[in-house]
């Protein structure tokens, strides 16, 4: 089985949680609320939301911020959640014994959550130094407009 390599660009840090025991649909409901927000705002939102999926996502966001500050030396106040994705994991299957020797299948879904944090101050500095206004080229707009009067005849459909 091939493993997909993650392209870790400079300025981005991620945390990955695998085999979290909850439905991917329920985790996506929380992830959609925090995508694109700052780190501090995300922590406040996750503490106040009443869903069970908030706790593992809170731990992952906190872990990604710890990775950013320890490994890359980023400031936690300038972190933004650039990507947040939830994928379906394996499904645990059990049999529950029922009456008269029968059994029902019980499925426990799992999911994989990936949180990617981006340092917004790094990208602001990069854009400031790399982009100069003289390098931008403006395209000329096409302003020559010719109007054709169709009421006088002579069009394509008038020929017999």
UniProtKB/Swiss-Prot annotation:
Chief localization: plastid
Q: Which CDD domains match?
A: Ribosomal_L22
Q: What the protein does?
A: This protein binds specifically to 23S rRNA.
Q: Which Gene3D superfamilies match?
A: Ribosomal protein L22/L17
| HAMAP family, per the entry | Ribosomal_uL22_B
Where does this polypeptide localize? Answer: Plastid, Chloroplast
Q: What gene does this protein come from?
A: rpl22
What is an example of a GO molecular function annotated in this UniProt entry?
rRNA binding
Instruction: Please give the SUPFAM superfamilies that the UniProt record associates with this protein.
Output: Ribosomal protein L22
Q: Which UniProt keywords apply?
A: Chloroplast, Plastid, Ribonucleoprotein, Ribosomal protein, RNA-binding, rRNA-binding
Q: Which family does it belong to?
A: Belongs to the universal ribosomal protein uL22 family.
Q: Which GO terms describe its cellular component?
A: chloroplast; large ribosomal subunit
Q: How does it assemble?
A: Part of the 50S ribosomal subunit.
User: What is the protein's species of origin?
Assistant: Eucalyptus globulus subsp. globulus (Tasmanian blue gum)
Query: Domain of life of the organism in this record?
Result: Eukaryota
Query: Which BP terms from GO are recorded?
Result: translation
Any idea what this protein is called? Large ribosomal subunit protein uL22c
Lineage per the UniProt record: Eukaryota, Viridiplantae, Streptophyta, Embryophyta, Tracheophyta
